[in-house]
Swiss-Prot record:
GO terms for biological process: defense response to Gram-negative bacterium; killing of cells of another organism. Keywords: Antimicrobial, Bacteriolytic enzyme, Disulfide bond, Glycosidase, Hydrolase, Signal. Pfam families: Lys. Its EC number is 3.2.1.17. Unlikely to play an active role in the humoral immune defense. May have a function in the digestion of bacteria in the food. Disulfide bonds join 24-139, 45-129, 80-96, 92-110. One of its GO terms (molecular function) is lysozyme activity. The active site is at residues 50, 68. This is Lysozyme B. One of its GO terms (cellular component) is extracellular space.
Length: 140
């Protein structure tokens, strides 16, 4: 009986943990949100290396006490308000929890803002994406 209760609790908690996307589902959703097609492979590469395409990831604490959130691992010191209430510049004007949901709209909009202000090198994993990029041609 205890095992059954644990399984039910895990099943109910699973949706709150986000979802795992793949290169094509990410590319299609970002395209539907208006992201230019010539950027989609770069975003797929970043998502692969930052979160393994998982929307519900909160990264380990950084050297300054901040954390990174969501599929693009957006930093809470600069871009979103952390749940702890700790100071944040909150440039995207949203709660970091909004970056952890199945709906990637907030993550995409905030990531686009990061890109426009800091460029691709804002992501520490960008060096993995500066040469070879995953193909998205078969996604459409």
């Amino acid at each position: 009986m205890k095992a059954f209760i644990v399984l039910v609790a895990l099943a109910l908690a699973a949706p709150a943990l986000g979802r795992t996307m793949d290169r094509c589902s990410l590319a299609r959703e970002m395209s539907n949100l208006g992201v230019p097609r010539d950027q989609l492979a770069r975003w797929a590469c970043i998502a692969e290396h930052e979160s393994s395409y998982r929307t519900g990831v909160v990264g380990p604490e950084n050297y300054n006490g901040s954390n990174d959130y969501g599929i693009f691992q957006i930093n809470d010191y600069y871009w979103c308000a952390p749940p702890s209430g700790r100071f944040s510049y909150n440039e995207c004007g949203l709660s970091c929890n909004a970056l952890l949901t199945d709906d990637i709209t907030h993550s995409v909009r905030c990531a686009q803002k990061v890109l426009s202000q800091q460029g691709w090198s804002a992501w520490s994993t960008w060096h993995y994406c500066s040469g070879w990029l995953p193909s998205i041609d078969d996604c459409f």
